[in-house]
Amino acid sequence: IPHGGGAVPYHWGRYRGLAQDMKRPPLKELLLNNVFFDTCVYHQPGIELLLKVIPIENILFASEMVGAVRGIDPETGQYFDDTKRYIENAVGLSDTDKKKIYEGNVRKVYPRFGRRRAS
């Protein structure tokens, strides 16, 4: 579960092409059944790219608050590591999609978490 997908969102087309050249199934079939990406990205454009490239079902909420970058962004006046606000401000993200990112997807990845919390 790399932060923001690491370099994956930037190289997604390359990976798709490599899979095709190697006669592998499309990446959505090959990888996205068990590969997930978190939202621990410290700026809105990074989250927007992640949401544009990776299916919502493969994105998990994450925050290091208070974490690696505790300062306040002089451009926004907000803490860099307040990753929830990037999800809240994402363009075109429905309430249903937000719920998947915040809790629904992680319950699919870690089903015991949901059972433990319910008990």
Per-range role (PLM):
Residues 3-119:
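H/E-rich (His + Asp/Glu) clusters that bind or coordinate divalent metals
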